[in-house]
């Protein structure tokens, strides 16, 4: 005890208080109560209360407040006892000590608790959150210490590293670095961590919906390489949307539907899923469901308009009905009206894919057809670590896939090529040094056309960044490109013009300025015109129109010479549909610029006629007619006046060329043969006239007309012969227009006579067939035709045939007729001589009438043939012929009726 006192004595008051408090805490409740009874403070307090009690007994009334204080004190003591009992149950109280142990506890070494249970040290990798932060260097050191790569510890550490890297990369992605993030993400084993990747993407999108288009582009790229990852993300999105719809969680529905909309825009999800979601949201419309549907429709409305117009029309029809019902809030009604305005503007503020995020080709994308109502497994097991017995094998497989995707297998070959190329460069430098010493120059020919591509790109950017053609020409001239690129510059100007939707005058003015600056540019455009016309069938109609209008502008402004039209040859064989369209647009544009009179005057320019021979052909009447029809069909018939005159004079030229050809080919005896032929013609005409006069005495006037006709033909032959001797060239014959016109009129009259003769012969044959059936009916048309310069042999043949037909008809009547009728006919019939006399009289009367009518018809025919030059089509001539023939047929019918009335059978 003394030692204990001696040790406590030098301590301060603060130490004593701490020891006292610790002693009181460690003592049991009974010891504390005994100590309170022994303490002087408690005794004084007790005496004070007792004196108060005696004082109140002496003369004062009972104080109720004191009783309440005593009750509170007792309750406090009971409460302390209860708490002490509870503590004593949990742990044995250290207050009950033996006197022997009290001495030992007073020492500082014995004040500390005897034994403490040490907590088991937990592995930080096995905790739920991954434990404390482990620096990367320490983590790599821990992984290196593990020799077995298939062990649980190593797989756990690699899983934690995979999770952290995926989360970090997903949180860093944006439009500018998405390609870099994709490459870094593919370096990790995302097949093993596909659950982690899906969870990270969905969490990042729900936390920041404004970057949904970026996450959708990221998912689209991963889906093109690993479709199972895209399918897993889409399944979880559908489940999240259904969960939010059931819970009436508008925010969850908004984020999920927005992500689905952008996946539809990226062709990861099918548009049927979008229509199903919209139908579900608008089936029982509320304020929140309509708001979610409108937000969803804004994001993917343009895509739906392109791929499913009927579906989006049905959705907007449903929105219109909801708006008319007016059962929703005013704010939502305004949202619907705004949605209709957005649709009217063509979703211009909501494009399908933003610029810079269209990173996957349509052919490489894999679209998932996942309906809304199916049951899906979210595969939450993939979010947590699970030991893989084939860990290293799966890692090697993913490395092979990663090499295929990122082309990492070519790195070694590239290094070898770099080493080899460095050696080759050294050798080339040595060779160049030797050649330079010898004084020779080395030229390198680039066959890859990289310089050409960059040159065309520079020209295109200069053209697109210029406000007017003068600024553009100034920029292009400052570039100082070589002369070999002159034609390429002209080609680039033409290509830029052809690519426009409509023709812009900017390019015509620019090309015209270059043509006026240098002759080389003009020659380049001349060559380009010929090349374009030869390959015009390769261009589309829109490009063809722009090219034609640009060249028309160059010709109108005289920037190009009109000699370039030499390559155009208008004929049915040398043109195609594309070339005809080109020529049509080209000349219509020229006519619009210059006007038809100026254009016609330019085409009639004598100095340019050699270049227009193919455009306005005169070599062949068929080609001439084709050119006339072509220009007339495109509304430029005024350009073909000379061609029409040439086409009219073509028969005259051909007739005039025949004597020259005969004169060049024939021998000197050709003149004698020509004279003999003329004599034979005259003898034939004389024989024809003698035959015609031998028919009857009434045909003398006809024979005289035939003889006069033969004399006229002889005169024509003499005139032709005189023309041969007088002129040998075609130009001299064309100048004698009067003689040629007279000959042409005579030929037309002869041709008209021949046509009328052939027509009358054809009708006479038809009437003979009809008259052969009736013996008493006479054939007046044969008489009519016999008077019109028909040869005597044909008339004799027709008479013999007529007599034979009549005799056969009489024989048939004699065989099959009644004997009484035969006797009456014998009595009343005339003799054959009397019949012939009657026929001759009738024929003379009708011949006189027919002669007068034929002369009138010849006058009409000659007048009509003289006016025939005014016709431009053959249809009107045919119509006039048919009208003439109809008049003749009517007159012949009248004559037939008259003859029937005057016939002997009628008189009897």
UniProtKB/Swiss-Prot annotation:
MIF4G domain ranges (all copies): 163-346
Compositional bias (Acidic residues): 407-438
GO cellular component: nuclear speck; nucleus; spliceosomal complex; U2-type catalytic step 1 spliceosome; U2-type catalytic step 2 spliceosome; U2-type precatalytic spliceosome
Keyword Phosphoprotein among UniProt keywords: yes
Regions of compositional bias (Basic and acidic residues) in chain numbering: 28-56, 66-85, 113-122, 726-792, 801-817, 826-908
Amino acid composition bias (Low complexity), ranges on this chain: 666-680, 703-714
Predominant cellular place of this UniProt entry's protein: nucleus
BP terms from Gene Ontology: mRNA splicing, via spliceosome
Pfam families (alphabetical): MA3 (PF02847), MIF4G (PF02854)
Bias (Polar residues): 100-109
Assembly with partners or alone: Component of the pre-catalytic spliceosome B and the catalytic spliceosome C complexes. Component of the minor spliceosome, which splices U12-type introns. Interacts with EIF4A3 and PRPF19 in an RNA-independent manner. Direct interaction with EIF4A3 is mediated by the MIF4G domain. Full interaction with EIF4A3 occurs only when EIF4A3 is not part of the EJC and prevents EIF4A3 binding to RNA.
Task of the protein: Required for pre-mRNA splicing as component of the spliceosome. As a component of the minor spliceosome, involved in the splicing of U12-type introns in pre-mRNAs. Promotes exon-junction complex (EJC) assembly. Hinders EIF4A3 from non-specifically binding RNA and escorts it to the splicing machinery to promote EJC assembly on mature mRNAs. Through its role in EJC assembly, required for nonsense-mediated mRNA decay.
Protein name: Pre-mRNA-splicing factor CWC22 homolog
Classification of source organism: Eukaryota, Metazoa, Chordata, Craniata, Vertebrata
């Amino acid at each position: 005890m003394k030692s204990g006192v001696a040790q406590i004595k030098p301590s301060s008051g603060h130490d004593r208080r701490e020891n006292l408090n610790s002693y009181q805490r460690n003592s049991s409740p009974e010891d504390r109560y005994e100590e309170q009874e022994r303490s002087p403070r408690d005794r004084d307090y007790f005496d004070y209360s007792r004196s108060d009690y005696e004082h109140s007994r002496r003369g004062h009334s009972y104080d109720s407040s004191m009783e309440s204080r005593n009750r509170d004190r007792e309750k406090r003591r009971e409460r302390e006892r209860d708490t002490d009992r509870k503590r004593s149950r949990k742990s044995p109280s250290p207050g009950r000590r033996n006197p022997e142990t009290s001495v030992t506890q007073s020492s500082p070494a014995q004040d500390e608790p005897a034994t403490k249970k040490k907590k088991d040290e937990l592995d930080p990798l096995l905790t739920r959150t991954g434990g404390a932060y482990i620096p990367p260097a320490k983590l790599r050191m821990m992984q290196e210490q593990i020799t077995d790569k298939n062990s649980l510890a190593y797989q756990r550490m690699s899983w934690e590293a995979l999770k952290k890297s995926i989360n970090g990369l997903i949180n860093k992605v944006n439009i500018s670095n998405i390609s870099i993030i994709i490459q870094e993400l593919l370096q990790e084993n995302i097949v093993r961590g596909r659950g982690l990747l899906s969870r990270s993407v969905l969490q990042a999108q729900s936390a920041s919906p404004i970057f949904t288009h970026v996450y959708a582009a990221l998912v689209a790229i991963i889906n093109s390489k690993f479709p199972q990852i895209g399918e897993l993300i889409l399944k979880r999105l559908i489940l999240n949307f259904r969960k939010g719809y059931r819970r009436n969680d508008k925010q969850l529905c908004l984020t999920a539907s927005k992500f689905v909309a952008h996946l539809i825009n990226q062709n990861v999800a099918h548009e049927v899923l979008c229509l199903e979601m919209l139908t579900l949201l608008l089936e029982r419309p509320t304020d929140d469901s309509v708001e979610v549907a409108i937000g969803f429709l804004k994001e993917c409305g343009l895509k739906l308009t392109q791929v499913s117009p009927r579906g989006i029309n049905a959705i907007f029809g449903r929105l219109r009905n909801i708006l008319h019902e007016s059962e929703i809030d005013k704010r939502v009604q305004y949202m619907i009206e705004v949605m209709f305005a957005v649709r009217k503007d063509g979703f211009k503020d909501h494009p399908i894919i933003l610029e810079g995020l269209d990173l996957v080709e349509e052919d490489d994308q894999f679209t998932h057809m996942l309906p809304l109502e199916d049951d899906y497994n979210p595969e939450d097991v993939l979010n947590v670590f699970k030991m893989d017995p084939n860990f290293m094998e799966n890692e090697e497989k993913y490395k092979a896939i990663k090499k295929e995707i990122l082309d990492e297998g070519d790195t070694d070959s590239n290094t070898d090529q770099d080493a080899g190329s460095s050696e080759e460069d050294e050798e080339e430098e040595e060779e160049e040094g030797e050649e330079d010493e010898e004084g020779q120059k080395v030229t390198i020919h680039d066959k890859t056309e990289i310089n050409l591509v960059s040159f065309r790109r520079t020209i295109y950017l200069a053209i697109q960044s210029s406000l007017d053609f003068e600024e553009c020409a100034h920029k292009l001239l400052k570039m100082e490109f070589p002369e070999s690129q002159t034609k390429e510059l002209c080609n680039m100007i033409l290509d830029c013009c052809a690519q426009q939707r409509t023709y812009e005058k900017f390019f015509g003015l620019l090309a015209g300025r270059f043509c006026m600056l240098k002759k080389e540019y003009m020659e380049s455009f001349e060559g380009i015109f010929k090349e374009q016309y030869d390959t015009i069938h390769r261009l589309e109609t829109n490009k063809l129109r722009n090219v034609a209008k640009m060249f028309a502008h160059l010709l109108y402004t005289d920037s190009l010479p009109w000699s370039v039209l030499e390559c155009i040859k208008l004929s049915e064989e040398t043109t195609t549909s594309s070339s005809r369209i080109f020529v049509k647009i080209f000349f219509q544009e020229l006519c619009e610029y210059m006007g038809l009179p100026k254009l016609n005057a330019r085409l009639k320019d004598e100095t340019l006629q050699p270049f227009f021979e193919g455009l306005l052909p005169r070599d062949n009447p068929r080609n001439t007619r084709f050119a006339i029809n072509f220009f007339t069909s495109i509304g430029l018939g005024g350009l073909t006046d000379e061609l029409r005159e040439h086409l009219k004079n073509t028969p005259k030229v051909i007739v005039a060329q025949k004597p020259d050809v005969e004169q060049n080919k024939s021998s000197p005896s050709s003149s004698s043969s020509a004279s003999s032929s003329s004599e034979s013609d005259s003898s034939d005409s004389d024989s024809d006239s003698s035959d015609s006069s031998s028919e009857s005495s009434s045909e003398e006037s006809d024979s005289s007309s035939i003889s006069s006709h033969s004399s006229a033909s002889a005169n024509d032959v003499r005139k032709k012969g005189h023309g041969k001797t007088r002129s040998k060239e075609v130009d001299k014959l064309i100048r004698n227009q009067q003689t040629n016109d007279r000959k042409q009129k005579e030929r037309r009259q002869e041709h008209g006579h021949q046509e009328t003769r052939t027509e009358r012969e054809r009708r006479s044959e038809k009437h003979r067939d009809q008259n052969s059936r009736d013996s008493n009916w006479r054939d007046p048309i044969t008489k009519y035709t016999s008077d019109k310069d028909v040869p005597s042999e044909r008339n004799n043949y027709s008479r013999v045939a007529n007599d034979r037909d009549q005799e056969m008809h009489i024989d048939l009547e004699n065989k099959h007729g009644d004997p009484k009728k035969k006797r009456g006919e014998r009595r009343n019939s005339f003799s054959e001589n009397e019949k012939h006399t009657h026929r001759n009289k009738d024929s003379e009367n009708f011949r006189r009438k027919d002669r007068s009518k034929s002369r009138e018809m010849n006058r009409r025919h000659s007048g009509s043939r003289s006016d025939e030059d005014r016709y431009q089509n053959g249809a009107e001539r045919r119509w006039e012929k048919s009208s003439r023939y109809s008049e003749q047929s009517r007159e012949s019918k009248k004559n037939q009726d008259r003859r029937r009335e005057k016939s002997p059978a009628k008189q009897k």
